[in-house]
A protein has these predicted regions:
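Long, contiguous binding/interaction regions
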Residues: 7-103
Length: 103
């Protein structure tokens, strides 16, 4: 049986890479501009795990597209994606890095 210390060492740290975290891309299509305040509030809540974000206004179609790159544990990514998915007037999809790749 692993000691408490060696369990956390093996689970979270190996060769300078934090384990248990994954990279994910969250794509958001905003059809209702009034949802922007709620989206920004949620993104601010999870700002510690956001690597970067890019917003593109697509005026010809009347939508905005937001791409958010995150580096966090699965449950954090799912919580963020779930909260965003509950906002009216937007569509959210999340793409995860394969488990074990560079982790």
């Amino acid at each position: 049986m692993l000691s408490y210390r060696s369990f956390w060492y093996k689970f979270f740290w190996k060769g300078g890479i934090v384990l248990g975290k994954r990279i994910a891309l969250i794509g958001i299509i905003v059809e209702n501009p009034e949802a922007a305040e709620k989206i920004n509030s949620i993104l601010h809540e999870f700002s510690s795990c956001i690597v970067g974000r890019m917003g593109i206004p697509y005026r010809d179609r009347g939508v905005s597209i937001i791409c958010v790159v995150v580096d966090a544990p699965n449950d954090t990514i799912s919580a963020m994606s779930g909260k965003l998915g509950m906002v009216e007037g937007i569509n959210v999809k999340t793409v995860y890095q394969k488990a074990g790749e560079n982790a």
